[in-house]
Regions:
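Carbohydrate-interacting regions of secretory-pathway proteins
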Residues: 1-190
Length: 190
């Protein structure tokens, strides 16, 4: 060892992390969530969601997926979250039209304050702080990992909520990590 330091001095036995049974991926014959996950969409209904204007979420549910219904407005989870890890699979339609921000523009809002951009950026240039995987108009993504229209994209988002002092100023800033299709787009971004 180093000058009186033993290996026991650097070994910790508490707190013991909880055991979480990993889920299976969809390529393995059907996706299952990890044992500690809160499932927000079961492939059948939007019972965990609501309209941001109040009332039921009225997007279209079919064939195990849900689809944006522009006429019905935005939706949000009924349950409120602070720190979380989110896994979401999404795609833009094969027949998508438009250019730049008019091509499948959507987003995942974190506590209603920060938006992880969802947009078709496959061969579709736009301003870089508004492309897929950006923290909209705040942080440029490290890469463009967008798949072709009609192919599934995967976001894994890890978010740590801000904390505040009594005067309303930040005690700790929020952080977000965004991984799209296995590629890091945001790495502990504040």
């Amino acid at each position: 060892g180093y000058a009186g330091i033993t290996h026991e001095m650097s070994e910790f036995y508490e707190p013991v992390p909880p055991v979480v049974t990993p889920g299976t991926d969809s390529k393995g014959g059907g996706f299952t969530a990890p044992s500690d996950a809160i499932v927000l969409f079961d492939g059948k209904d939007l019972s965990a969601w609501e309209s941001v204007k109040g009332g039921a979420a009225e997007w279209d549910v079919h064939d195990g997926v849900f689809t944006v219904n522009k006429k019905k407005g935005d939706i949000q989870t009924k349950q409120k979250f602070n720190d979380f890890q989110m896994h979401i699979e999404w795609q833009v339609p094969t027949n998508i039209t438009g250019e730049s921000q008019s091509r499948g523009n959507s987003g995942i809002f974190l506590q209603g304050m920060y938006e992880v951009q969802v947009l078709d950026c496959y061969n579709n240039p736009t301003y870089v702080n508004g492309q897929t995987g950006s923290i909209y108009k705040q942080s440029i993504p490290l890469a463009n990992a967008m798949r072709k229209p009609g192919e599934w994209n995967v976001y894994d988002i890890i978010y740590t909520a801000p904390t505040f002092k009594e005067d309303g100023s930040y005690r700790t800033h929020p952080t977000v990590t965004v991984i799209q299709n296995g590629v890091v787009l945001q790495n502990h971004t504040t």
